[in-house]
């Protein structure tokens, strides 16, 4: 990979990993509501699911041109529906002022999010088909970059969770408003799948 292409790869992957999306918003919300330590199950579920999805993207990238457009469209609708459900859960979750301490979303729920998270699927397919496959089709490179993509994504999730933890007091003071804003951002993510 040339230095120019490598620079573009890092720019694309880091910006994509750090911008708002279902994972980052969920990480922020969980750490704000429950603290960083309580959110490690959520982060672990995201990370494992992210890795598996990136490996699946590696396989899909080889044959992307022949994928049935109806299947891709169906995946988009499933992803949007799950993201809207997640937005509803965040918008209606109790805040500290409500006097209730809801449990964070489970490992398996955050794991399952990855398989309908169109942002990370597109992230993986785009990075692999744009930066890796034109340079090499060696399986070791494709798998290695897939693992790297998952690590970069996990880094973004942890950064957002740490922000939620560090600003927890402020976020808890304005918990209801924060939950509404995060839910609206998730709705925006769902709409952006189609437009």
Curated annotation (Swiss-Prot):
One of its GO terms (molecular function) is amino acid transmembrane transporter activity. NCBIfam families: PRK10323.1. It is found in: Cell inner membrane. This is Cysteine/O-acetylserine efflux protein. It comes from Escherichia coli O139:H28 (strain E24377A / ETEC). Residues 29-46, 91-104, 163-176 are cytoplasmic. Keywords: Amino-acid transport, Cell inner membrane, Cell membrane, Membrane, Transmembrane, Transmembrane helix, Transport. It comes from the Bacteria. Exporter of O-acetylserine (OAS) and cysteine. It catalyses: O-acetyl-L-serine(in) = O-acetyl-L-serine(out); L-cysteine(in) = L-cysteine(out). InterPro entries: LeuE-type. Belongs to the Rht family. GO terms for biological process: cysteine export across plasma membrane. Residues 1-7, 68-69, 126-141, 195 are periplasmic. One of its GO terms (cellular component) is plasma membrane. The chain crosses the membrane at residues 8-28, 47-67, 70-90, 105-125, 142-162, 177-194. It is a multi-pass membrane protein.
């Amino acid at each position: 990979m040339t230095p120019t292409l490598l620079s573009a790869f890092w720019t694309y992957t880091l910006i994509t990993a750090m911008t708002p999306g279902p994972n980052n918003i969920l990480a922020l919300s969980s750490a704000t509501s429950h603290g960083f330590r309580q959110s490690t199950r959520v982060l672990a579920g995201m990370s494992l699911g992210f890795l598996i999805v990136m490996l699946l993207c590696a396989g899909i990238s080889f044959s992307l041109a022949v994928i049935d457009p109806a299947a891709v469209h169906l995946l988009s609708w499933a992803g949007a529906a799950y993201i809207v459900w997640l937005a509803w859960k965040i918008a209606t979750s109790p805040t500290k002022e409500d006097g209730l301490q809801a449990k964070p979303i489970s490992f398996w729920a955050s794991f399952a999010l990855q398989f309908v998270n169109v942002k990370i699927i597109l992230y993986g397919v785009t990075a692999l088909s744009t930066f890796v496959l034109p340079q090499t089709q060696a399986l070791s490179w494709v798998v290695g970059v897939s693992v790297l993509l998952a690590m970069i994504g996990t880094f973004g999730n942890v950064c957002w969770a740490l922000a939620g933890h560090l600003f927890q007091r402020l976020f808890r003071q304005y918990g209801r408003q924060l939950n509404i804003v995060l839910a609206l951002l998730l709705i925006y993510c769902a709409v952006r799948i189609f437009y």
